[in-house]
Amino acid sequence: MAAKIRRDDEVIVLTGKDKGKRGKVKNVLSSGKVIVEGINLVKKHQKPVPALNQPGGIVEKEAAIQISNLAIFNAATGKADRVGFRFEDGKKVRFFKSNSETIK
């Protein structure tokens, strides 16, 4: 099945502590989760690694978030949108349901 949300898509968070925030998809995981830039930040306690000259401490990084909690952002309407699929010139492409505009 083709993915409705892919890497480098601009998405908006629908639910949770980051509701309403927008970000760019960095990575799509096979478990139905994605990692979004600047969204779902968690603090990790990291031990120092002297061999690699890495200091220890508390590091903030992005955690995975469920795809169902995200929607693709339509820049033309300025809102979250749903994604559909259609064939154009023999290729399967994604489009916004609200205005039928093809997604890059």
UniProtKB/Swiss-Prot annotation:
Transport in keyword set: no
Matches recorded under CDD domains: KOW_RPL26
One Pfam family linked to the record: ribosomal_L24
GO biological process, one term: translation
Keywords: Ribonucleoprotein, Ribosomal protein, RNA-binding, rRNA-binding
GO molecular function, one term: rRNA binding
GO terms for cellular component: cytosol; ribonucleoprotein complex; ribosome
Alphabetized PROSITE patterns for the sequence: RIBOSOMAL_L24
Domain of life: Bacteria
Annotated InterPro entries: KOW, Rib_uL2_dom2, Ribosomal_uL24, Ribosomal_uL24_CS, Ribosomal_uL24_KOW, Translation_prot_SH3-like_sf
NCBIfam families: rplX_bact
Family classification: Belongs to the universal ribosomal protein uL24 family.
Quaternary assembly: Part of the 50S ribosomal subunit.
Alphabetized HAMAP family for the sequence: Ribosomal_uL24_B
Function noted in UniProt: One of two assembly initiator proteins, it binds directly to the 5'-end of the 23S rRNA, where it nucleates assembly of the 50S subunit.
Protein name: Large ribosomal subunit protein uL24
Phylogenetic lineage: Bacteria, Pseudomonadati, Pseudomonadota, Gammaproteobacteria, Enterobacterales
